[in-house]
Amino acid sequence: MSNTHCVLIGAPVDSGKQRRGCLMGPDAYRTANIEQALADLGHTIEDRGNVAPVPHSNTAHPKLHALSETIGWTEALAGAAENGLSDGLPIFMGGDHALSLGTVLGAMRFAASSARPLFVLWLDAHSDFHTPDTTDSGNLHGTPLGYVTGRPGFVGFPQLPYALPQENVAIIGLRSVDAAERAALQDTAIQRVDMREIDETGIARPLSAFLDRVAAAGGMLHVSLDVDFLDPGVAPAVGTTVPGGATIREGHLVMEMLHDSGLMTSLDLVELNPFLDERGRTAQVMVDLAASALGRRVFDRPTRAY
């Protein structure tokens, strides 16, 4: 990946779950100097500020948390993603994972207009494959992959230009999948890599296989990095902590491989809750990972004093 025009877009989405705090995420990334970290790599940086949801009703839903607001965010972020992709490589600073309902939709629209297939790499402890009908929690941050792959039940959400092909999706880092999602995923073509597979064979092999498919298809690649992909021992600032996650080194390897491939066209940084952080530790880790995805090497990465 040569020098890139990075478009920073704040997505202070806090409607996808009931535990508050992710709305502070964009400012935490800015405070952790994400702009300087990427500029130091030779990239040009444009910070477009924070997106706001399109106007929406505040009508309560008997089962789903903040449905109308989340639909408003989806519409707004889809437009921001399309515009960002027109101008460079958009980096969405979240914000909970419901933001990806919009960012992936926007990437799908842009890919369709460019006559290229879109692929999605989901780095997450969870599969986020629920629908509004199957979620027990009512939290819509657990539904983005269900939405973009065309599962039913997303009444009121923007219409998809097409259903993202299952074989174009890889989820890496799985270690918390509930029974309904497991059953729904079982017969899909989605590539699913859980932590046991990573323990047994390493993280490079399945990622390399997926990237080979993206390259062979001439595809665009949207990467969605959830804080809980990482072990909470190194990234505690997330409301959905699940022990046994990826190590710092595994995280950087993934990002370095993405940079080496030259395939990544957009990036989500999601679920950072600064209210739960330790002196900005997790925000800094996520900034370092973003820098690795944009070309920082091991010997360039500064040692952090936490």
Residue ranges and their predicted role:
Residues 1-2, 111-115, 137-138, 160-164, ...:
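Solvent-exposed alpha-helices and their adjacent loops that cap or buttress functional pockets
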Residues 2-13, 18-92, 99, 103, ...:
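Catalytic cores of soluble, metal-dependent hydrolases
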Residues 85, 89-158, 261:
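Active-site histidine-anchored catalytic micro-motif
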Residues 88-90, 166-170:
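Short active-site oxyanion
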Residues 122-125, 149, 173-176, 194-196, ...:
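Short, structured patches in soluble enzyme cores that scaffold and shape functional sites
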Residues 170-178, 247-249:
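A general structural motif
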Residues 177-186:
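Short, glycine/polar-rich helix-capping loops at beta-to-alpha or helix-loop-helix junctions
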